[in-house]
């Protein structure tokens, strides 16, 4: 599933084409994705002007001039492709012929200046909804969500409060969207390794002085992943069709049995399953 860096990569790819654009035509090739599309989906979007493109955790938020916000989640295999007007070159575009009868091309957005943005989703785990803009923050998807890890609202104090007295491991708590928004399995494994913290140690037993470095590791890992376009595992690609490259920088994720890259550490990367997800770690330098 695309995590925060992948969704941010998609947002940045769509922004030059959609921000400030007016939707001349919207086509929904089926009535549902993971959930049914909202009533009047096509009619409510057609003719609307896109004010900007935002991201909250792993959601794309598209406020419109009509008072609605288009909320989109990529699920497991959702992706966008962009075809710009002939002769127009824009950052993030993937110039290709759009195939209207592609069975996985579920929603097509056409702007007044001729750009075509197509949403593909073979497994249909993604979804789209329209929510009144002034109610987005109170919507059940967002109301209890923690701070953005790349924002100023996330710091060591956030983790001190979240970890205090807790018996669960830090990975479990970091994956809880109420603690911090948008973190997923890959980047939590990587951040814990950089901070040399065991994913299995009860969070309440981790000294407070270690949470500053963990906060920094989380921010650094995410920022580096965004910079190189995320991690291309299985189905993810950016809007220009390019693959992300952060997977080439993994220190522990998907590296079971390989030497730990920490200088001076002689450990081997291990893997254990926690709550149905693989946890990659070094048993020597993560304590």
From Swiss-Prot:
EC number(s) on file: 3.2.2.23, 4.2.99.18
Signal peptide (UniProt feature, chain positions): none
Required cofactor(s): Zn(2+)
PROSITE patterns: FPG_CAT, ZF_FPG_1, ZF_FPG_2
GO molecular function: 8-oxo-7,8-dihydroguanine DNA N-glycosylase activity; class I DNA-(apurinic or apyrimidinic site) endonuclease activity; damaged DNA binding; zinc ion binding
CDD domains: BRcat_RBR, EcFpg-like_N
Residues where DNA binds: 104, 123, 166
InterPro entries (UniProt xref): DNA_glyclase/AP_lyase_DNA-bd, DNA_glyclase_Znf_dom_DNA_BS, Formamido-pyr_DNA_Glyclase, FPG_cat, MutM-like_N-ter, Ribosomal_uS13-like_H2TH, Znf_DNA_glyclase/AP_lyase, Znf_FPG/IleRS
Keywords: DNA damage, DNA repair, DNA-binding, Glycosidase, Hydrolase, Lyase, Metal-binding, Multifunctional enzyme, Zinc, Zinc-finger
Quaternary structure (record): Monomer.
NCBIfam families: fpg (TIGR00577), PRK01103.1 (NF002211)
Protein name: Formamidopyrimidine-DNA glycosylase
Organism field: Caulobacter sp. (strain K31)
Taxonomic placement: Bacteria, Pseudomonadati, Pseudomonadota, Alphaproteobacteria, Caulobacterales
Gene (name only): mutM
């Amino acid at each position: 599933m695309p995590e925060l860096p992948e969704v941010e990569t998609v947002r940045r790819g769509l922004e030059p084409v959609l921000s400030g654009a007016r939707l001349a035509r919207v086509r929904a090739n089926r009535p549902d994705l993971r959930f049914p599309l909202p009533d009047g989906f096509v009619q409510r979007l057609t003719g609307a002007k896109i004010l900007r493109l935002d991201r909250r955790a792993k959601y794309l938020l598209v406020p419109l001039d009509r008072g609605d916000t288009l909320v989109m989640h990529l699920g497991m295999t959702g992706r966008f492709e962009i075809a710009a007007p002939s002769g127009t070159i824009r950052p993030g575009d993937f110039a290709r012929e759009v195939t209207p009868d592609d069975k996985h091309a579920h929603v097509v957005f056409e702007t007044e200046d001729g750009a075509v943005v197509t949403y593909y989703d073979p497994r249909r785990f993604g979804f789209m909804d329209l929510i009144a803009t002034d109610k987005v923050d109170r919507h059940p998807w967002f109301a209890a969500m923690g701070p953005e890890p790349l924002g100023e609202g996330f710091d060591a104090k956030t983790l001190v409060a979240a970890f205090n007295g807790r018996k669960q491991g830090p990975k479990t708590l970091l994956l809880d969207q109420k603690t911090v928004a948008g973190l997923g399995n890959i980047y939590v494994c990587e951040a814990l390794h950089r901070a040399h913290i065991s994913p299995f140690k009860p969070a309440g037993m981790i000294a407070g002085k270690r949470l500053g470095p963990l906060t920094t590791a989380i921010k650094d890992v995410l920022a580096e992943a965004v910079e190189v376009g995320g991690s291309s595992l299985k189905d993810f690609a950016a809007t220009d069709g390019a693959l992300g490259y952060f997977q080439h920088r993994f220190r522990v994720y998907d590296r079971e049995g390989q030497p730990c890259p920490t200088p001076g550490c002689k450990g081997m990367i291990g893997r254990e399953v926690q709550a149905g997800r693989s946890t990659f770690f070094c048993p020597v330098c993560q304590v």
